Amino acid sequence: MLKEPPKNSREKTKNLLLTLQDKICSGLENIDGKGKFTEESWLRDEGGGGRSRVLKNGSIFEQAGVNFSEVQGKELPQSIISQRPEAKGHEWFATGTSMVLHPKNPFIPTVHLNYRYFEAGPVWWFGGGADLTPFYPYLSDVRNFHKEHKKACEKVDKDLHKVFKPWCDEYFFLKHRNESRGIGGIFYDYQDGSGNIYRGNNQNGEASKVSENIGKSNLNWDNLFSLAENCGQAFLPSYLPIIEKRANKTYTSKEREFQLYRRGRYVEFNLVWDRGTIFGLQTNGRTESILMSLPPLARWEYGYKAKKGSREEFLTSIFTKPQDWLNDKDLENFCMENNIFD
């Protein structure tokens, strides 16, 4: 039986996620220098609402969206009931902050973040994560992103990152393309401190195997709240140094074209596979906010093949496959030799 969450659980998570939205928006405006977020507050007919913030045509960001929502409903959709059958027939509450940034410069990666909390009758859980999608590969950027999120997870429990990293690789995977959306990061869902850490669907995958070896989770509500807090705070230090390094790098029209081509994969994932998009649409969420994750421009090209030995080819052959980014010395040497380390 799950322990009940604290009496102020909803207010506490709501405030955490509102603060996260504020801090991220402030950090992004500061580094962009030109663009400002416009805010739109909205209400949902079935209960709750949110505030959507979008920055367009900044000096760094072509489009950046940071959303907060706090919503309630009578019955969770079947996609969630299948994971949490105890929630069936109960009214539910969900709050979350989600973000997708689409920079203009192809050398700055697209990035996504989402942290959320659910309650439904006797059950509650936390979910979240952050992942990076580069268009041009630089191992040092990838390492910084992973290092900061690993550190955030390990503040709560030394074993979490061992599961969340492969879980992220598994989740952000385009099955119809047989490639990863980007270089991963962390991903977790249905965390309530009971059972094993891994709660995904692939029992034969690395995340499941690592989780099985670790055994039962002994985290409580406060630990999982701290996890969301730590990981949320890790975002700016994981990403802003990449912008600082790459923002002034000039790019060609060919590199911009490749960025737009790869953005097409982002669109495909979000519309075909992403559970957050599907949940939002199934629960009559605000469509403009749900589809804010899509880039303002993208392109498709039939039968595209990158030139062998090009940076574009290194992206598609190495940086869209799960790797041990932090520890693989062979990968490090390869990136050094091919000028894609830093």
Swiss-Prot record:
Region annotation Important for dimerization: where it falls in the sequence: 266-301
Biological processes, Gene Ontology terms: chlorophyll biosynthetic process; protoporphyrinogen IX biosynthetic process
EC number: 1.3.3.3
Record's GO cellular component terms: cytoplasm
Location in or out of the cell: Cytoplasm
Site positions per UniProt: Important for dimerization: 176
Positions bound to a divalent metal cation: 102, 112, 146, 176
Catalytic activity as recorded in UniProt: coproporphyrinogen III + O2 + 2 H(+) = protoporphyrinogen IX + 2 CO2 + 2 H2O
Molecular function GO labels: coproporphyrinogen oxidase activity; metal ion binding; protein homodimerization activity
Protein family: Belongs to the aerobic coproporphyrinogen-III oxidase family.
Its biological purpose: Involved in the heme and chlorophyll biosynthesis. Catalyzes the aerobic oxidative decarboxylation of propionate groups of rings A and B of coproporphyrinogen-III to yield the vinyl groups in protoporphyrinogen-IX.
Higher taxonomy: Bacteria, Bacillati, Cyanobacteriota, Cyanophyceae, Synechococcales
Protein name as annotated: Oxygen-dependent coproporphyrinogen-III oxidase
This protein's pathway: Porphyrin-containing compound metabolism; protoporphyrin-IX biosynthesis; protoporphyrinogen-IX from coproporphyrinogen-III (O2 route): step 1/1
Record's keyword terms, sorted: Chlorophyll biosynthesis, Cytoplasm, Heme biosynthesis, Metal-binding, Oxidoreductase, Porphyrin biosynthesis
